Amino acid sequence: LESSQRGKKGMFLACQYPQEFPGVSVLNFLRQTVEARTSKEISILNLRKQMLAWMDKLDMDSAFADRYLNEGFSGGEKKRNEILQMALLEPDFAVLDETDSGLDIDALQIVATGVNEIMKSRPHLGVLTITHYQRLLDHLKPSHVHILVEGKIIDSGGFELVEKLDTEGYEAWL
């Protein structure tokens, strides 16, 4: 399926390196994507209101709503913007591809809190988090963990695998 079709079906992808879209404001991007996802027109005023509430939760300046999508955003701003998109699009399944990449400790906490709030409000939301580091997982507390080596799942279990990986490294599985 094309990415737009996957999005309409309820799949969300937060990329490791979010793309910039010069000329497309965050607000207009979200209006178009929310309308495509729901097949309903959305009031720009209502959308802005929802955006501003989430931007406040994600410690984003409200001016970002009118800036071009990811253009000139720092790494942390791009990641927060992706969580904003995830919140407003209300996907059924989300893939967070190295969402913690390049985040300082404060930004990581804000992003993780946002993801947790989305998951709490949408208990049936499936989230696949791809990461190389334990820090994000410490905040998200995944129910299932899969260890991949060379593209293959070599072990599956609960959060205890995260702790084992952190203390023993991949050597425990090689």
Indicate where each model-derived feature is located.
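ABC ATPase NBD coupling module
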Residues: 1-12, 165
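Q-loop/switch helix immediately C-terminal to the Walker
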Residues: 9, 13-17, 23-38, 50
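Short coil-to-helix "N-cap" segments within the ABC nucleotide-binding domain's helical subdomain
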Residues: 37-56
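Helical segment within the ABC ATPase nucleotide-binding domain
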Residues: 108-123
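Conserved H-loop
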Residues: 122-132
